């Protein structure tokens, strides 16, 4: 075969391969089914059109379980741009005995039929008789195979480069490799599918994602914020960190190469979002305020507590260092849970607390001693800083409560009325340290027995004297008593109770531990 003929044939092969790899239908439909359609408020079954970016491929998928020989479908629908699904016309699960079966394919309604064919190890026969081949067969084989391999490698390399460039923004080259991903309960399970960005913060963004038939939250850190990701993972991995009022941790993973790398933290997903977002759109009743405040206080009290002798080890006391309404999440029943441990400090016996740089956190929630740079670097000092911030979060709740006989304010952040939405460190020092101002407690709040008690508790949380502040456990007990007391008070009793508010038998005032 002449050189010109070989070149022409190679060009033909490349064009054919490009068409096979890059060519695909602009529209695709998949069979849709959702076993949890009532909970998710979707149709149970139907046909789902697949949408997505033009440069992304669209697939269909199916997940099912085999329960004692009975097939139970979990979900069917569209699946977006997964390399494991490329050029599969049939929906076939090949992994050996998975807990949940999963397959994906390309083509309209290709997930209507699905099957399970585990890959079997093929044994080589002891003898393999060679059949004679014509002499020109070897010439074609040795000529075409290298050309096809080269063409395939070039096309695949171009596609991977183009796809990767669009999928990931450029990041700085790290001075240190973050090392292998930590052990994760997610390893070995089906891949996550990112659905939508729910929040953006200082250390990355939070996605709503789907893991098989449940939603999870994925917090994605760029490599520059490796320290925050590592710290949060280490705190979640401490003994005793499973608690109703602390965000449930699922796993941590590293995605990408050593240069283009993202660090993932996977947790439970709560549709109501943060307390801040909830208060922007909703007012709360007295009972709702008490439930949110009590569960938030119990979560912080558990975080602050040093608990030896647990089954999985010793839980140290932990200071959050960034308590704010954005870092308190609400479950569907308005139970609060504490989130975001990127700045948290753990206090283990005989060990340094690590980087104890004082001025960290969100400016408007910084305690006076933090703003002054006059922190006593002891455990209790850090716990009292958390309690100052908790007082501000309680004020946010009070400002949106309907219990008092008066207007409910529009939602505002602490000190937003005094300083605005973007205070500088100097602004906060002037207002909080020098003028000793705090957010306004409305006069008409005092006319409601429970709100009057809450105002007193708030003032004791944000006291200028750190050692005079309440502990989180004490706040939780007080709120329980407030709710119990106000639920048995009649309208005629309110005036009497308000005059006696300072004599209520509250739990004894105590410091942060």
Curated annotation (Swiss-Prot):
> What are the EC numbers?
2.7.11.30
List the ranges whose topology is Cytoplasmic. Answer: 162-513
Q: Where does ATP bind?
A: 198-206, 219
User: Which GO terms fall under biological process for this protein?
Assistant: anterior/posterior pattern specification; BMP signaling pathway; determination of left/right symmetry; embryonic skeletal system development; gastrulation with mouth forming second; male gonad development; mesoderm development; odontogenesis of dentin-containing tooth
The membrane-spanning stretches of this chain are: 136-161
**Reaction catalysed by this enzyme:** L-threonyl-[receptor-protein] + ATP = O-phospho-L-threonyl-[receptor-protein] + ADP + H(+); L-seryl-[receptor-protein] + ATP = O-phospho-L-seryl-[receptor-protein] + ADP + H(+)
Question: Protein name, please?
Answer: Activin receptor type-2A
Q: Which organism was this protein described from?
A: Mus musculus
Supply the gene name. Answer: Acvr2a
